[in-house]
Amino acid sequence: MEKLLKDYSDLEKGAYLGAISSIATADHAASDEEMEYIMALAESADLSDEQRRAVSQAATELTGQELKKCLDILKDSDLKFSLVTDLISFAEADKKYSDEEKANIEKIAHYLGIDQQQFSLLDQFVKKTAEVNPGVEEVSHPSFLSKLGLDEKLKKSGININSLTKGLLSIAGPMILANLMRGRQSRGVSSSLNPFSTGGGGGLGSIISMLSGGRGFSRTGNMFNRVFGL
């Protein structure tokens, strides 16, 4: 079965999923359904027990310190570009990408060392990808960024285009989780997860809903202010 974030170290994968989990549950401790989904992502990424515990802690800790730990690890990883791209994708999912939501994502990008030009290009990548609505295999193809007309711009800005599309949870997550759920069902393991859910009852749609404003992504600003000392 295809693995999530397969080309990255255990520490990087744990930091990436930990950051997503921490932001998604910024104003509350993760529910049982949310935790089941988050742990399914950890399973699909083949995380070690140590990193699974770290991701779980990030989903239940509300001070923002676990998020800071995750971001500090990602500062030196190409996954930082994938993380910001995913956050923009999640924020735009409900077509209500507010100025406050954008400002919160920009805080994360700035903390990760992503400059304004790079952020603007990642934003363009999200918009152009949404227009094409590609499948997982198409996005991972070497020619995909060229088709969007962004490959040279991304290269010149210092973004590693070979790694950008390999860490996109917003694109790869549903398909990988669907395969994971089919594997569980074949073994007779029950689960409430629906990776294609678009509502607030668990699954990728639940995470998107939380990050896009369904549960107030804009309200995560309070935690970000604590983390970044603003």
Range-by-range predicted roles:
Residues 1-22, 32-93, 99-230:
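Small-residue-enriched hydrophobic alpha-helices in membranes
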